[in-house]
Amino acid sequence: MARKSLIQRDKKRKKLEQKYHLIRRSSKQEIHKVSLLSEKREFYVKLQSSPRNSAPTRLRRRCFVTGRPRANYRDFELSGHILREMVEACLLPGAIRSSW
């Protein structure tokens, strides 16, 4: 199980990313539209003035049961071993173990 402080930090980052999403996206679009270097610089300053943790690259996908940051399946938002346990216990409808 991941430390609770790391899970809370990621939740805080997710809130910040959602709050500044439109601002960051619009300033990035304006950077690509504008051809003058001085105007581009203004939009870069606006982009850099937003908090560092509001960037989507700072987010880490975590298992919502254990908080484990690695080996996560996007479709289920679960880590590999929890996914396997839940499939074996028939807790995920439609998911079956492969056999060949």
Swiss-Prot record:
Gene designation per UniProt: rps14
A GO cellular component annotation in the UniProt record: small ribosomal subunit
Identification of the protein by name: Small ribosomal subunit protein uS14c
Q: Which PANTHER family match?
A: 30S RIBOSOMAL PROTEIN S14 (PTHR19836), SMALL RIBOSOMAL SUBUNIT PROTEIN US14M (PTHR19836:SF19)
Q: Which InterPro entries match?
A: Ribosomal_uS14, Ribosomal_uS14_bac/plastid, Ribosomal_uS14_CS
Q: Mind listing the GO biological process terms from this record?
A: translation
Q: What is its main location?
A: plastid
Alphabetized HAMAP family for the sequence: Ribosomal_uS14_1
Q: How does it assemble?
A: Part of the 30S ribosomal subunit.
Q: Name one GO molecular function term.
A: structural constituent of ribosome
Described by its record, this protein's role is as follows: Binds 16S rRNA, required for the assembly of 30S particles.
Q: Which NCBIfam families match?
A: PRK08881.1
User: Origin, by domain of life?
Assistant: Eukaryota
**Keywords from the UniProt entry:** Plastid, Ribonucleoprotein, Ribosomal protein, RNA-binding, rRNA-binding
Q: Which family does it belong to?
A: Belongs to the universal ribosomal protein uS14 family.
Query: Whose protein is this, by species?
Result: Cuscuta obtusiflora (Peruvian dodder)
The disulfide bridges present are none
Where does this protein reside within or beyond the cell?
Answer: Plastid
